[in-house]
């Protein structure tokens, strides 16, 4: 069931649109937030709480910070909870991480992608 998510062409198109804009150095928070909300609407029917939550936390984070301050999750989980969360906070707008975050939605059949989304969720909540 989870793999269906991004077989939804409409959601994929929106993700591609955001990624294209990022490549062209276009980072318009209001547009991105609207697109993420639309993607979230589409994905609600998947009944995948991790995905729905990740999208909501992402647009709330962007909305309140006007930037994406979450880093790419580490490959290996760090022993102490604190350093793990600190490592996932960026000092500046992290376009690379945001792009990676978006790419996770394009293939949710990969267990690691879902695990990384969970890490992003933890970092959003800790921010």
Predicted regions and their residues:
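C-terminal-biased regions
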Residues: 6-44, 49-127
């Amino acid at each position: 069931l989870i793999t269906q998510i991004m077989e939804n062409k409409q959601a994929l198109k929106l993700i591609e649109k955001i990624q294209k804009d990022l490549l062209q150095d276009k980072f318009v928070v209001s547009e991105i937030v609207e697109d993420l909300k639309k993607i979230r609407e589409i994905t609600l029917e998947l009944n995948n709480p991790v995905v729905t939550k990740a999208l909501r936390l992402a647009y709330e984070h962007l909305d309140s910070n006007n930037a994406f301050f979450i880093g790419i999750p580490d490959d290996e989980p760090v022993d102490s909870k604190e350093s793990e969360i600190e490592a996932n906070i960026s000092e500046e707008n992290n376009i690379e991480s945001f792009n990676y975050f978006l790419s996770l939605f394009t293939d949710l059949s990969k267990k690691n992608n879902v695990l990384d989304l969970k890490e992003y969720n933890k970092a959003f909540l800790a921010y």
